[in-house]
From Swiss-Prot:
GO terms for molecular function: RNA binding; structural constituent of ribosome. It comes from the Archaea. It holds the Pfam family Ribosomal_L7Ae. This is Large ribosomal subunit protein eL30. GO terms for biological process: translation. It comes from Pyrobaculum calidifontis (strain DSM 21063 / JCM 11548 / VA1). One of its GO terms (cellular component) is cytosolic large ribosomal subunit. Gene3D superfamilies: 3.30.1330.30. Keywords: Ribonucleoprotein, Ribosomal protein. Belongs to the eukaryotic ribosomal protein eL30 family.
Amino acid sequence: MIDIGRELQVAINTGKVIIGLRETKKSLLTGAPKLVIIAANAPRWAREDIEYYAKLAGVPIFTFPGSSIELGAAAKRPHKIMALAVVDPGQSEILKLVEHA
């Protein structure tokens, strides 16, 4: 089983991760990230918005099994994170989350 928190940290430190709902949506419209992670407690409107743009871009979505507060803590950030986009995983194996989901 993949440790989501550790792999997310490795992706942030060695790759490129876009944090935030608005920025994630922009990246789906312009750059097509490799993976989108959304918090389990994201509001329905936000989830539907991200799912729509991810489907258009052909990007897989992984639902983080915790709240936006826990996703922020996993990313070592002092705030809530509703969604993030992995543009470059770096040395992490975070893209394997999609295979296990």
